[in-house]
Amino acid sequence: MAGIFYFILFSFLFGICDAVTGSRVYPANEVTLLDSRSVQGELGWIASPLEGGWEEVSIMDEKNTPIRTYQVCNVMEASQNNWLRTDWITREGAQRVYIEIKFTLRDCNSLPGVMGTCKETFNLYYYESDNDKERFIRESQFGKIDTIAADESFTQVDIGDRIMKLNTEIRDVGPLSKKGFYLAFQDVGACIALVSVRVFYKKCPLTVRNLAQFPDTITGADTSSLVEVRGSCVNNSEEKDVPKMYCGADGEWLVPIGNCLCNAGHEEQNGECQACKIGYYKALSTDASCAKCPPHSYSVWEGATSCTCDRGFFRADNDAASMPCTRPPSAPLNLISNVNETSVNLEWSSPQNTGGRQDISYNVVCKKCGAGDPSKCRPCGSGVHYTPQQNGLKTTRVSITDLLAHTNYTFEIWAVNGVSKYNPSPDQSVSVTVTTNQAAPSSIALVQAKEVTRYSVALAWLEPDRPNGVILEYEVKYYEKDQNERSYRIVRTAARNTDIKGLNPLTSYVFHVRARTAAGYGDFSEPLEVTTNTVPSRIIGDGANSTVLLVSVSGSVVLVVILIAAFVISRRRSKYSKAKQEADEEKHLNQGVRTYVDPFTYEDPNQAVREFAKEIDASCIKIEKVIGVGEFGEVCSGRLKVPGKREICVAIKTLKAGYTDKQRRDFLSEASIMGQFDHPNIIHLEGVVTKCKPVMIITEYMENGSLDAFLRKNDGRFTVIQLVGMLRGIGSGMKYLSDMSYVHRDLAARNILVNSNLVCKVSDFGMSRVLEDDPEAAYTTRGGKIPIRWTAPEAIAYRKFTSASDVWSYGIVMWEVMSYGERPYWDMSNQDVIKAIEEGYRLPPPMDCPIALHQLMLDCWQKERSDRPKFGQIVNMLDKLIRNPNSLKRTGSESSRPNTALLDPSSPEFSAVVSVGDWLQAIKMDRYKDNFTAAGYTTLEAVVHMSQDDLARIGITAITHQNKILSSVQAMRTQMQQMHGRMVPV
């Protein structure tokens, strides 16, 4: 009987040879240790028992290549224990290996008379060993890996039809520690053929990321372990940040950190740093590509870090390598001189050729030349003055003064730029020679009062620095200071001193002196102010009486000064004491009150980060896996271990590579905001990493993620008390923010995070950045994006965000929580939502929502923001509801979720209308009166049972009209239920 089964099984194997002899190409991250299909000749595995158990069979494929298989089919005999052991397999450093088994198995039901002995499974075992010395199978040494069952088994019919039913199973085992291992297959009574056995391990293959090469890395021992690998920069590159990656258990590289940059003279191409081509260059180690040599420059070798300037062209010291080479300018044009006595005005035009630069300036060279030989010139010296300046002129004119009269001067105007010093040439200048005229003397530099009496002042002065000829006389002008030159006197003298007499005692006078030559008067000197005495100077200090008088007067003056000073000090002390008291009182009143500080008000945004966020060493952080992608980069989970503290789970936001300064500032601004908050219902900031890359924000880890997704996942699983508890936590956090004068602007269930204890915490403080990437945002008429469905009408219309607008958003969050994460306003468009709110519509109560909670929602949705409750009042209301669970009884409607009709607070009271016509007129829908009458809806009792399909059936197809009518219908239904006592009033 067994021989027949072998024959059948052997015949069936010919039908599957095509499936197992295809090209054996395995993934790059799998390293094969054993492949039975690749063995040339017999496998020679050890079987126990040697006879009657496993049997090696060779079959030929269509290319006449033998395939070695093992089969066994002892299904007629009970208590089978047939073992087959492989040769010793070296593990090559792998800690976890994988076994891929391809096999066929006979369906026991297709074999007659074997129901008690036939099995459809076999067992897989392994045994570790440091050497290949085991010649026999010792069953006790082997550890079981798994029991292998077939997904598909074949029958006699399949054999006849040559239908292939090949099973493939993969198992893994680890961690392994010895040099090698054996595999064993135990048959317990199945009809089975091992078509192929492949043993392999996984590795993260050699790869290049961010110009860093990461070697082949064998995966870790656990199926969830990550192996940190440091990369090495490719040739011709250097580290910018330490390149690291994590090798995952599946053989895939994860979370690249850091990067390398191509050296100067090299650029990245296909993951390599290749030398710049001839004619190209790269000056620095950056991620930029090689650039073509700028104009008037060249490179003659590969890998150039700069380009050489053409002959006659230069590059200034502060010129970047990317700037063109330039040359000095040509000479200025059209030099014109204008001589005025001993001053000269020069004007000229810009050079015809600027040399390719914009930093042109002009220098003036002055030379004084002899009359007999103009070629013998010498510098003018420091006595000559230039307006506005002599060198570095940005204008094309200069005024030169304080020259000597009747003297020959040569003036050179040089045009210079940033490269003139490399090639000074006379071609850059233009000159002119002039002769000064006869000139008046210069002003007198120093005038002194030698003696002052009651009625006179004795003056003396120096000769002008440049007399420009023979001084004929000096003129002294003086006047009383109070007259301010309205009435003055003139005294002339040939000497350089004079006595001015006939003055008034104790009077201030102002004196001016000027010189005159044959060319005329020079300028007056600077004013000299002198005050005449009250008594003759000889009286003061002569005799005892004068001494007593002087002491008495001096003492009186001192006494008056002391009294005045004492009074002033007393007043100041009084004011200071009062001001100090007020300041102390103000400080006392403000003690303990914290106010939110906007980080964008800091001139240096980094200062806000340093002030409000704690810097964490990157070595304290271990990234475990990526859990999402945010606006600025990846969001990961990981662990934080600060020295002296226990290790905690954290969430890690990373800033993606290639960020701009603005993106970095916006990214860290959220940390500057979070760092100011300390409340159990506000997400807690652990710290930031800014001193290395990637830049990271570290916060506490919230296991259950965002509130909206969490509620949808757990629809209907919580009690009303639990839901109200969540709302209470959110309200408490918002009260804290409101007390700190912080306006959130984007309060929604998606921005509330939930931890493992169902504690809800407010997060996402990035609304100060416009919500460009928020899928719920929509353009408003004033530009920018805001989440329409959660935003108060005044914030939509006027962008007026306050704590009251946050209260409106909180009402929407209440509705989201009680509806288990439904989308507010369902599938209505944003424009329809805005229009409906403007018309007074509000969201209906979710299914099973207590009346008290929906009423609180309606309070939050008051049109006038001053009518909305404060967050403190909201928290108090929720506390009362939690303490009084009877107030949270269900509403009358529990059959289904409400339809898409919105509630209209302006709907008429049911008691105020008596007919369908009155009702339609009250809600301004009387145009449909005939539709209702024709369809038989003639009483209000019939109307309250209508649905949206009923309205469409009677010809009301406009969605907005359907919503308005259904809103009023629902309001009437609620009023009827209240009148019949089916709802508990709060």
UniProtKB/Swiss-Prot annotation:
It is an enzyme of class 2 (transferase). Residues 570-986 are cytoplasmic. One of its GO terms (molecular function) is protein tyrosine kinase binding. This is Ephrin type-A receptor 4. Glycans are attached at N235, N340, N408. The keyword Secreted does not apply. It comes from Mus musculus (Mouse). InterPro entries: Eph_TM (IPR027936), EphA4_rcpt_lig-bd (IPR034270), EphA4_SAM (IPR030602), Ephrin_rcpt_lig-bd_dom (IPR001090), Ephrin_rcpt_TKs (IPR050449), FN3_dom (IPR003961), FN3_sf (IPR036116), Galactose-bd-like_sf (IPR008979). The keyword Transferase applies. Its EC number is 2.7.10.1. Residues 911-975 form the SAM domain. It catalyses: L-tyrosyl-[protein] + ATP = O-phospho-L-tyrosyl-[protein] + ADP + H(+). Belongs to the protein kinase superfamily. Tyr protein kinase family. Ephrin receptor subfamily. A motif (PDZ-binding) lies at residues 984-986. Keywords: ATP-binding, Cell adhesion, Cell junction, Cell membrane, Cell projection, Developmental protein, Endosome, Glycoprotein, Kinase, Membrane, Neurogenesis, Nucleotide-binding, Phosphoprotein, Postsynaptic cell membrane, Receptor, Repeat, Signal, Synapse, Transferase, Transmembrane, Transmembrane helix, Tyrosine-protein kinase. The chain crosses the membrane at residues 548-569. Residues 20-547 are extracellular. Coiled coil: none annotated. Disulfide bonds: none annotated. It is a single-pass type I membrane protein. ATP binds at I627, G628, V629, G630, E631, F632, G633, E634, V635, K653.
